[in-house]
Amino acid sequence: MRIVSGTHKGRLIHPTSNMAVRPTTDFAKESLFNILNNRIDFEETSVLDLFAGTGSITYEFASRGAKDITAIDINPRCCEFIRTTAATYGFLNITAVR
């Protein structure tokens, strides 16, 4: 998995094998964000990522400059992974909630 566009374009995301998730493919993310790019101003947007899993969509919004992002997942491993990855990439606008 990778971040498709924005300030962190091309950075890889390496989820641990103990997370029972199916991450959104790069192709699907690229298609989704091509549509959103023409409709919203990311810098003025607050995002709620439900069922965040690995945080793939969360990081994509952060890389594109979303104002603040809340990622929610029931799995504590997923939330911890999102927090760790956000800190690694310097995304200060991400909050992970279980």
Enumerate the language-model features and the residues they cover.
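Class I S-adenosyl-L-methionine-dependent methyltransferase catalytic core
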Residues: 1-98
